[in-house]
């Protein structure tokens, strides 16, 4: 049975990967046919499928990181994730649906730090070769206002 401790450890590793700028590893947290979306609470409540960020495969996530490294121009910054404990809604030995509250601080190259996003991850986990992977992650942001500088994944 997939449990909260496994999911909390997974989320900690996920956050560390993003926060330490090991972005090339980020897509490996997902299945090949994953779904990743960043949306806001109002759009999610209304069932609107479009998101601020939307990807439907691990390859799309890899392309996003390639663009981040090679093509996009943005002000240098980094994130620090603060995560709550996960809550499992359903699950068995190989799959689980869970939600986890998050807050992401953005630290600019100048040292200025601000709350960038807060909300909850709505996740569908599966196991592949005994390791947890995200089949789906929807990052539902509390605010309907999104900074245009969402270069890094939440």
From Swiss-Prot:
<dbReference type="GO" id="GO:0018963">
    <property type="term" value="P:phthalate metabolic process"/>
</dbReference>
<comment type="function">
    <text>Component of the terephthalate 1,2-dioxygenase multicomponent enzyme system which catalyzes the dioxygenation of terephthalate (TER/TPA) to 1,2-dihydroxy-3,5-cyclohexadiene-1,4-dicarboxylic acid (DCD). It can also use 2,5-dicarboxypyridine (PDC) and 1,4-napthalenedicarboxylic acid (NDC) as substrates, and preferentially uses NADPH which is the physiological electron donor.</text>
</comment>
<dbReference type="GO" id="GO:0005506">
    <property type="term" value="F:iron ion binding"/>
</dbReference>
<dbReference type="InterPro" id="IPR037401">
    <property type="entry name" value="SnoaL-like"/>
</dbReference>
<dbReference type="InterPro" id="IPR032710">
    <property type="entry name" value="NTF2-like_dom_sf"/>
</dbReference>
<comment type="subunit">
    <text>Heterotetramer composed of 2 alpha (TphA2I and TphA2II) and 2 beta (TphA3I and TphA3II) subunits. Part of a multicomponent enzyme system composed of a reductase (TphA1I or TphA1II) and a two-subunit oxygenase component (TphA2I or TphA2II and TphA3I or TphA3II).</text>
</comment>
<protein>
    <recommendedName>
        <fullName>Terephthalate 1,2-dioxygenase, terminal oxygenase component subunit beta 1</fullName>
        <ecNumber>1.14.12.15</ecNumber>
    </recommendedName>
</protein>
<keyword id="KW-0520">NAD</keyword>
<comment type="similarity">
    <text>Belongs to the bacterial ring-hydroxylating dioxygenase beta subunit family.</text>
</comment>
<keyword id="KW-0560">Oxidoreductase</keyword>
<dbReference type="Pfam" id="PF13577">
    <property type="entry name" value="SnoaL_4"/>
</dbReference>
<keyword id="KW-0223">Dioxygenase</keyword>
<dbReference type="GO" id="GO:0018628">
    <property type="term" value="F:terephthalate 1,2-dioxygenase activity"/>
</dbReference>
């Amino acid at each position: 049975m997939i449990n909260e401790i496994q999911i909390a450890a997974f989320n900690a590793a996920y956050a560390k990967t993003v926060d330490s700028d090991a972005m090339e590893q980020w897509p490996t947290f997902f299945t090949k046919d994953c779904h990743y979306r960043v949306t806001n609470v109002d759009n999610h409540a209304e069932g609107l499928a479009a998101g601020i960020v939307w990807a439907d495969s691990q390859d799309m996530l890899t392309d996003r990181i390639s663009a981040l490294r090679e093509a996009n121009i943005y002000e240098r910054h980094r994130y620090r994730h603060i995560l709550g404990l996960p809550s499992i809604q359903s699950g068995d030995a190989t799959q689980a649906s869970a939600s986890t509250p998050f807050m992401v601080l953005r630290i600019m190259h100048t040292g200025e730090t601000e709350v960038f996003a807060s909300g909850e991850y709505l996740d569908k986990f599966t196991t592949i070769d005994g390791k947890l992977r995200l089949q789906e992650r929807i990052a539902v942001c509390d605010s309907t206002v999104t900074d245009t500088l969402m270069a890094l994944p939440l």
